[in-house]
């Protein structure tokens, strides 16, 4: 079972949602899966993209005409309608960005899984890793995560849709159904990003275990046969170190492909989540301030809080997963300098900077490989980027919290100043 076959259910779902334009074709002489170009899937994707763009533009013009007829509605209802419209537009823009990136970066998606296959072959041959068991475990974990995420989305959106169906107005059912469809596609795009990042982290964990088991020096009795075995073990350890270094080089290239495949989606999705969280918090503040403590008002406040939960969960999981994956490179560097060496051995003593001109190949190989691998870990650091605008890690959470707090303070101050001016004018 290769990685593509292990993730076949996910790819089938992404094909339906226009997030995977490749056709999965089994080769005639093996059990794997090949990626074949499908013009029908590409035509399907471009058709849905054009239709979604037209629907979004039509919704913008329709909303502008509706706002001209709603001068008589209250301030709180007007603000609530504006908040809903902002989130609807943000979700549709994120949906369009995901569809466009899936079509535009289809070659990068193919290169990602091709590079992943090369990494698995190196792990299987050079490091003797049971890649088959790793893929089976990955498929089980992916299925389990998909069930939990789908359950969370279903519960939150059913509560939101129920609250809006009970509200005043005849256009809410169509309004929210048109919102839920892009939301599910964006959620599936998030799951694609989670899965790709988890694939990278799984390979880094294998490298970390291999490096922790690496020993260049093992104590034993000074017997000729034992010394010969010791030299064989050291040579095997050097081969293992070279393999770890080569695999890390490919993992670094794999992360670069991941940033190409999903960078624009991460940028637009995180931006949309920021808008949704900020607008929902502002709307909840207004409801708390002006609600009459009726069951309907409480339901609206709870629905707004639940509405923010998927957006907050997506940003939280994405930031933590990317940050922990990037930290694996730092752990590799720490493990590299904890490799057991014998300073009395000339080949190992060369690690501190002394090289013998006339020596065996192993004597030169040890310091060169460790030193070069250390420099490689220093300069080829793993980072997940949202189209080059910002890095996705735990600092993103702090930035979003700070920006949300700042904008909420500004919006609340504007609202309170407008209320004060309105009350003064009514008093006069």
Curated annotation (Swiss-Prot):
GO terms for biological process: chemosensory behavior; detection of chemical stimulus involved in sensory perception of taste; male courtship behavior; monoatomic ion transmembrane transport; sensory perception of taste. Residues 62-145, 195-250, 322-349, 417-428 are extracellular. It is a multi-pass membrane protein. Keywords: Cell membrane, Glycoprotein, Membrane, Receptor, Transducer, Transmembrane, Transmembrane helix. Signal peptide: none annotated. It holds the Pfam family 7tm_7. Its main location: membrane. Expressed in neurons of the terminal external chemosensory organ, the dorsal external chemosensory organ, as well as in the dorsal pharyngeal sense organ of larvae. Glycans are attached at residues 195, 345. One of its GO terms (molecular function) is taste receptor activity. It is found in: Cell membrane. Residues 1-40, 167-173, 272-300, 371-395 are cytoplasmic. The chain crosses the membrane at residues 41-61, 146-166, 174-194, 251-271, 301-321, 350-370, 396-416. GO terms for cellular component: axon; dendrite; membrane; neuronal cell body; plasma membrane. Belongs to the insect chemoreceptor superfamily. Gustatory receptor (GR) family. Gr2a subfamily. PANTHER family: GUSTATORY RECEPTOR 8A-RELATED, INVERTEBRATE GUSTATORY RECEPTOR. Probable gustatory receptor which mediates acceptance or avoidance behavior, depending on its not yet determined substrates. This is Putative gustatory receptor 2a. It comes from Drosophila melanogaster (Fruit fly).
């Amino acid at each position: 079972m290769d990685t593509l076959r292990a993730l076949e259910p996910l790819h089938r779902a992404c094909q339906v949602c226009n997030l995977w334009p490749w056709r999965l074709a089994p080769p005639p002489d093996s059990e794997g899966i090949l990626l074949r170009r499908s013009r029908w899937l590409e035509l399907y994707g471009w058709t849905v993209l054009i239709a979604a763009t037209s629907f979004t533009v039509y919704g913008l013009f329709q909303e502008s005409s509706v706002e001209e007829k709603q001068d008589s509605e209250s301030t709180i209802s007007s603000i609530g309608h504006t908040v809903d419209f902002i989130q609807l537009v943000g979700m549709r823009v994120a949906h369009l960005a995901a569809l466009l990136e899936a079509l535009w970066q289809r070659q990068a998606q193919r290169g990602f899984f091709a590079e992943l296959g090369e990494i698995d072959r190196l792990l299987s041959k050079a490091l003797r890793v049971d890649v088959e068991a790793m893929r089976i475990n990955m498929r089980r974990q992916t299925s389990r995560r998909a069930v939990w995420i789908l359950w969370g989305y279903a519960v939150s959106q059913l509560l939101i849709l129920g609250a809006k169906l009970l509200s005043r107005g005849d256009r809410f059912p169509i309004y929210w159904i048109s919102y839920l469809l892009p939301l599910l596609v964006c959620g599936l795009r998030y799951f694609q990003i989670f899965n790709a990042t988890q694939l990278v982290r799984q390979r880094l964990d294998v490298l970390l275990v291999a490096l922790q088991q690496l020993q260049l020096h093992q104590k034993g009795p000074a017997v000729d046969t034992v010394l010969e075995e010791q030299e064989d073990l050291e040579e095997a350890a050097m081969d293992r170190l070279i393999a770890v270094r080569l695999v890390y080089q490919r993992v670094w290239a794999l992360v670069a492909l991941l940033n190409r495949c999903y960078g624009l989606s991460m940028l637009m999705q995180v931006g949309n989540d920021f808008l949704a969280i900020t607008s929902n918090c502002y709307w909840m503040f207004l409801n708390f301030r002006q609600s009459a403590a009726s069951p309907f008002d409480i339901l609206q406040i709870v629905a707004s809080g639940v509405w923010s939960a998927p957006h907050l969960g997506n940003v939280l999981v994405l930031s933590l997963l990317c940050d922990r994956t990037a930290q694996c490179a730092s752990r590799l560097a720490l493990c590299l300098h904890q490799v057991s060496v014998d300073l009395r051995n000339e080949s190992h003593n060369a690690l501190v900077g002394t090289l013998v001109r006339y020596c065996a190949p192993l004597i030169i190989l040890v310091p060169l490989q460790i030193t070069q691998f250390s420099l490689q870990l220093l300069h080829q650091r793993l980072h997940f980027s949202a189209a080059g605008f910002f890095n996705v890690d735990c600092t993103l959470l702090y930035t979003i919290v700070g920006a949300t707090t700042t904008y909420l303070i500004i919006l609340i101050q504007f609202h309170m100043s407008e209320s004060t001016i309105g009350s003064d004018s009514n008093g006069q």
